[in-house]
Design a protein with these regions (language model features):
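Active-site loop immediately N-terminal to the catalytic Tyr-X3-Lys motif
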Residues: 73, 121-127, 149-150, 182, ...
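C-terminal substrate-recognition "lid" of short-chain dehydrogenase/reductases
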Residues: 186-212, 216-217
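Active-site helix of classical SDR
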Residues: 95, 132, 140
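Alpha-helical segment proximal to the catalytic Tyr-Lys
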Residues: 100, 145-149, 203
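Residue(s) in the substrate-gating loop at a strand-loop-helix junction
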Residues: 116
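Substrate-binding pocket helix/loop in short-chain dehydrogenase/reductase
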Residues: 57, 71-72, 79-84, 167, ...
């Protein structure tokens, strides 16, 4: 299955992911746009569909997100809106656009939303991020019921502390002590769960939020 990789500004990192997929024997292409800009999304997908008249997106992974951490009484309007625009509104814009073609085909489809432990339990200093991810979880459950009759499944994955660019500035040694397994998770571990939810084996699973956090629930 060819992979379409969206990115906003980091072309070098996106190209590295593309190369990794191709080195493993897969096919991939880049599709740059700002997930918070509905006009940019429509233009990019219109162009992609024009270039691929016989193809359609069967699996959508909503993974766009940013952090602008701050305690609420010091949080600026831009810190609040930037996080919700990318993390929550981006999910809405992209999913709405692709559902227009995913649903009428009646071939089924997979939507996997990357939520977060922050959206499950809330994290201090992340009221904006926690709100966006909690809303994403609610939207996952609602949308799953809306599209189930078209054989489209919608699920969410809620990672805890994972070794990514978004957690690079966090004190990993200290935070690992909070995790019963004693370590951060890896992107490969999250990817394996996403791959399962996107597979035929998960065709009867929908509306679920699956935590992957090393036992960190409270």
């Amino acid at each position: 299955m060819p992979v379409v990789i969206n990115y906003h500004s980091n072309h070098e990192a996106a190209q590295a992911v593309k190369q990794e997929i191709e080195d493993a024997g897969g096919m991939a292409e880049l599709l740059p746009f700002d997930a918070a800009d509905p006009s940019a999304i429509d233009a990019a997908i219109d162009q992609w569909e024009e270039n691929h008249p016989d193809d359609h997106v069967a699996v959508l992974v909503n993974n766009a997100g940013i952090r602008r951490d701050n305690v609420m009484f010091m949080m600026g309007d831009d810190e609040w809106h930037q996080v919700l625009d990318t993390t929550l509104n981006g999910f809405f814009y992209i999913t709405r656009r692709l559902l227009k073609h995913m649903m009428p085909r009646r071939r089924g489809g997979r939507i996997v939303n990357i939520a977060s432990l922050s959206g499950v339990k809330g994290m201090p200093g992340q009221a904006n991020y926690s709100a966006a991810k909690a809303a994403l979880i609610g939207a996952t459950k609602a949308l799953a019921q809306e599209v189930a009759g078209r054989q489209v499944t919608v699920n969410a994955v809620a990672p805890g502390f994972i070794e990514t660019d978004m957690t690079r500035d966090l004190p990993q040694d200290e935070l690992s002590k909070l995790v019963p397994m004693g370590r951060f998770g890896t992107p490969d571990e999250v990817a394996a769960l996403v791959a399962f939810l996107a597979s035929d084996q998960a065709s009867y699973i929908t509306g679920e939020v699956i935590n992957i956090n090393g036992g960190l629930y409270t």
